[in-house]
Design a protein with these regions (language model features):
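Acyl-donor binding region in acyl/amide transferases
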Residues: 52-117
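Terminal substrate-recognition subdomain of acyl/acetyltransferases
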Residues: 32-46, 94-140
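Short linear motifs at secondary-structure transitions and domain/linker junctions
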Residues: 4-10, 19-20, 27-35, 67-72, ...
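A conserved beta-strand-loop-helix scaffold within acyl/acetyltransferase catalytic domains
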Residues: 19-60
Length: 140
């Protein structure tokens, strides 16, 4: 069963970032994904005056996972971070992980590429109206 949980301590966050080969961001909040008790992925995110920022969304590198576990872990964890950002009253979010592939996953999570190349989503009513996702309604 897939679980997405906040990482409770900075040492745990740092260790999971090392397992995912991503930089540890001491000032970022973080979630971890697990499937059947096995940690699969980590997400680091933050908020500032500009909006929410998903800095990293990555699988741990020390174990192989099925495509299903990989896709579900990344998609649901990305959406969980977006929902937390939205619940904090921050209604703009940016996907900042420039090394993340494939772009299709970023789009399926809900982000759209702006003219400047940044990935953006307007979270206003995003979780109220799920049918709007992916239809060009998320503009900066």
């Amino acid at each position: 069963m897939l679980e997405i949980l906040p990482i409770q301590t900075k040492p745990e966050q740092e260790a999971l970032c090392a397992r995912a080969s991503i930089p540890y961001r001491v000032d970022a909040m973080a979630y971890r994904a697990s499937v059947d008790g096995e940690i699969t992925a980590v997400c680091q995110f933050s908020m500032d005056a500009e909006g929410g920022h998903i800095h990293d969304l990555a699988m741990v590198k020390d174990k192989e996972f099925s495509d299903r576990d990989r896709i579900e872990s990344l998609f649901v964890m990305g959406r969980a971070a977006m929902n937390f950002i939205d619940l904090c009253g921050v209604h703009k979010a940016y996907f900042e992980d420039t090394a993340f592939e494939p772009e299709g996953m970023i789009k399926s999570i809900g982000f759209e590429k702006l003219e400047d190349g940044r990935w953006f989503v307007d979270l206003t009513d995003f979780f109220v109206e799920p049918c709007q996702h992916g239809h060009g309604l998320n503009k900066a």
